[in-house]
Amino acid sequence: MAWHQALGFGAENYRFHDHEKLAHYANAATDIEFHMPFGFKEVEGIHSRTNFDLSQHEKYSGKQIKYFDPQTNESYTPYVIETSIGVDRMFLSIMCHAFCEEQLENGETRTVLRLPAALAPVKLAVLPLVKKDGLPEKAREIVDQLKFHFTCQYDEKDSIGKRYRRQDAIGTPYCVTVDHDTLQDGCVTLRFRDTMEQERVSIADLNAIIEEKVSITSLLKKL
C-alpha cells in the first residue's frame, strides 16, 4: 500500500478487499483497490500461499527447504507471500487520477495531466518568451545543459500562455521561461504545473532544483 500512496493520489482512494473464497493452498488473500471513475477496481493482489509451494518442492525433489530459527531452535518450511501488480492496471489508475479539466478565473478551461513528477515522460520544458533578441539561443543553451540529466522539451511556437497549456496537457511538471532579464541576471522563471505558481531561480541552480523534484529517488523516499 505504501507504494500506491506514495504516488500522491490520496489514501481515501485506496481500500483493501479481502477474498471470501480462497485457493486450496491459501489461508488469506486480499486486493488493493483504487477508486476509478467507474468504481473501485483491483490494482494489486496479495495472497498468502502458506508453505504449500516449498512443501511441494520438498516432496518431489527429496530436498529439505527449511529455515532454522536460532531463537526458538526450530526448523520450519517458510510461507510464500505472493503479490501481483498489473502494469496496465497501475497505468490506468494513474491516468484516471491525473487527468483533470479545471475552470480558471478567466472562464477558460485548463486541461492538466497531474502525473507524479517522477513518472512524467517529460520533466521540463524550456521556453523563450519571444523568438528574438537572443532568447531562443539562451533557451537552447539551457536545454543542452540539462538534457543529460532528464528529458527536456524546447518550444518556441505560439504565445507563452499557449505553450504552458500544451505542457500542462502532456503532464510536464515544470516549465522554465527565458526572458530578457535572463540575459542580464542569469535567472529564469520556473513555473509549477499543478499550481501555476512561478518563482525566479538561478540557471546555475536549475539542475539541482529539478533533480530533487523529479527523480525516482524522491518518490522512493516516501515509502
PLM region descriptions:
Residues 1-223:
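NTP/phosphate- and nucleic-acid-binding module
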